[in-house]
């Protein structure tokens, strides 16, 4: 999608004026110089003055020059343990894509769901969110959006066949948008609404699914890194399994809220009433045609290949190793090792990732039986280096916020503002602020700034750190309103099926629902599971360490 001249001009002005307005901050202390660097980075990310990955490297130069963090301390931040873990998930996602396993799983489940529009929408959202457990939200949307378009095209062909309209419509031009290819303008309001709901559901479900697993998305990894760094003696812990216990139950409620909003907005509330109605003869015929098309798409994939089976087994081994290393309620395989502190989740991730580069994709191929599932050329062409560097920049921002004292400054300011406020209104306020911020900044940068701050605010107010940090982390993924908020939104908006107003309205309603659901979860299920009414022992609050603010 080529940007308009007006948008290009606005971006150039933003890139020029943003840092210029913040220049006075350079004449104050390190915390204000750190704030300048954050404004500089945010402006360049939003304005896209450089590629996102290139902008993400600026902290390596800005922090030493502005005397915020020495170069030797900021450079290793870009290759933390959590970064390695994220790289392993991206490599596994590449293997899934290389073998076509994701498409087989999606189509197989859709053959079981059926072709009734409301049921298909719900089934597609569940499938997308499940895939997003283990694949980044951007990759998940990029994988599932074409699948959704293929399903909609098959439905459109089935409708034409049902009408016995054998006149071939004028083929769309090569540069036609998805909306033009689907001929949405010629559809009934119900069918057009279903198309819009299914396309937008790709973004919603992938973002929601990313909240379920601690390795799924950047803010979750930022949270994990902050917990490990801030509480090295285990005063506060969060294992892979503990996160699932916290995040999966509300994820289903987020998904249900998104489903209800999409159906009501695009298809009308009466759709739920029609769910239980007996279909007409024409509707039953159409349903059979669509199901037949889906079945044909699945059969065209052929038998399950050796590569698909191999990736599936490695996938299960990887997830199993993460869950069983330190389950929390019982000793894991990590406890069997003499030096358990030497092992983290990235170890099994690296081992399996390396195997994927030598394991044969098809040992029965007469031409090249030893061709591996992944090649190094895939790392050069398909690996998301920009996303990896973006998360590294997020950790760099977090390091600068901590070392410069900006975390303490903001924490004390927030404490003074929220003094006398009870814990529930405080939590709702913080979550709402994060949701607003993440609509205009990347979820990683938002999390990198506010997760350590939320931990500091909670400690300084005598509240369990997880009570504010968990909703802060999850809220970073609630970027549903704008195309610039997150890449999944940009992917679905680029289809031209969804208008800006439709995305904003649905996203706004879903944001409100997610804030309320998160608060309900934190004050019921999570409050009980993690004993959030008890402040952890052995948390040392020292004025000499900016990580533990004393106001």
From Swiss-Prot:
InterPro entries according to UniProt: Na/sul_symport_CS, SLC13A/DASS
Parts of the chain that traverse the membrane: 9-29, 34-54, 82-102, 119-139, 194-214, 243-263, 347-367, 417-437, 449-469, 497-517
Subcellular location: Membrane
GO biological process, one term: lipid metabolic process
GO MF annotation, one: symporter activity
Keywords: Ion transport, Membrane, Sodium, Sodium transport, Symport, Transmembrane, Transmembrane helix, Transport
The keyword Membrane is annotated on this UniProt entry: yes
A GO CC annotation given for this chain: plasma membrane
Entry membrane topology: Multi-pass membrane protein
Functional note: High-affinity sodium-dicarboxylate cotransporter that accepts a range of tricarboxylic acid-cycle intermediates with 4-5 carbon atoms. There is no interaction with monocarboxylates.
Assigned protein family: Belongs to the SLC13A/DASS transporter (TC 2.A.47) family. NADC subfamily.
Name of this chain's protein: Sodium-dependent high-affinity dicarboxylate transporter 2
Gene (UniProt): nac-2
């Amino acid at each position: 999608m080529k940007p308009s001249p007006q948008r290009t001009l606005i971006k150039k002005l933003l890139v020029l004026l943003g840092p210029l307005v913040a220049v006075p901050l350079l004449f104050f202390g390190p915390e204000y110089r750190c704030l300048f660097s954050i404004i500089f980075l945010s402006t360049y990310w939003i304005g896209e003055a450089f590629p996102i990955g290139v902008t993400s490297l600026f902290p390596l130069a800005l922090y030493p020059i502005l005397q915020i963090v020495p170069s030797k301390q900021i450079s290793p931040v870009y290759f933390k343990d959590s970064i390695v873990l994220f790289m392993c998930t991206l490599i596994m996602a590449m293997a899934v894509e290389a073998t076509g396993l994701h498409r087989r799983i999606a189509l197989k489940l859709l053959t079981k769901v059926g072709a009734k529009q409301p049921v298909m929408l719900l089934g597609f959202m569940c499938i997308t969110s499940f895939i997003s457990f283990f694949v980044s939200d951007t990759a998940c949307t990029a994988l599932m959006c074409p699948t959704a378009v293929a399903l909609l095209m098959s439905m459109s062909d089935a409708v034409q066949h049902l009408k016995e309209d054998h006149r071939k419509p004028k083929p769309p031009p090569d540069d036609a948008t998805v909306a033009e290819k689907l001929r949405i303008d010629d559809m009934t309001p119900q069918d057009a609404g279903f198309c819009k709901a299914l396309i937008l559901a790709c973004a919603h479900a992938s973002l929601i699914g990313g909240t379920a697993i601690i390795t799924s998305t950047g803010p979750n990894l930022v949270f994990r890194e902050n917990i490990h760094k801030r509480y090295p003696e285990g005063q506060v812990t969060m294992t892979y399994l503990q996160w699932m216990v916290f995040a999966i139950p509300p994820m289903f409620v987020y998904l249900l809220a998104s489903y209800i909003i999409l159906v009501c907005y695009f298809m009308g509330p009466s759709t739920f009433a029609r769910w239980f109605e007996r279909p007409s003869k024409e509707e039953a015929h159409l349903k059979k045609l669509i199901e037949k098309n889906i079945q044909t798409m699945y059969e065209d994939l052929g038998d399950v290949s050796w590569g698909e089976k191999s990736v599936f087994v490695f996938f299960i081994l990887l997830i199993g190793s993460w869950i069983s290393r330190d389950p929390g309620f019982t000793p894991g395989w990590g406890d069997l090792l003499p030096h358990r502190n030497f092992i983290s989740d990235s170890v099994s991730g690296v081992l399996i990732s390396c195997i994927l580069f030598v394991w044969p994709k098809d040992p029965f191929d007469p031409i090249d039986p030893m061709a591996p599932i992944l090649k190094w050329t895939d790392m050069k062409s398909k690996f998301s280096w920009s996303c990896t560097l973006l998360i590294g920049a997020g950790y760099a921002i977090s390091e600068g916020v901590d070392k410069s004292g900006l975390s303490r400054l903001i924490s004390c300011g927030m404490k003074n503002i929220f003094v006398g406020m009870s814990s529930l209104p405080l939590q709702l306020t913080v979550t709402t602020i994060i949701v607003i911020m993440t609509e205009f900044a990347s979820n990683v940068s938002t999390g990198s700034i506010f997760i350590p701050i939320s931990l500091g605010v909670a400690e300084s107010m005598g509240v369990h750190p997880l009570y504010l940090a968990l909703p802060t982390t999850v809220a970073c993924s609630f970027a549903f309103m704008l195309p610039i908020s997150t890449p999944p939104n940009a992917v679905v908006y680029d289809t031209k099926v969804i208008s800006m107003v439709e995305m904003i309205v649905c996203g706004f309603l879903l944001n409100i629902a997610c804030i309320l659901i998160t608060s309900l979860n934190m004050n019921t299920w999570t409050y009980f599971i993690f004993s959030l009414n008890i402040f952890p022992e052995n948390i040392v609050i020292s004025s000499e360490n900016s990580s533990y603010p004393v106001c």
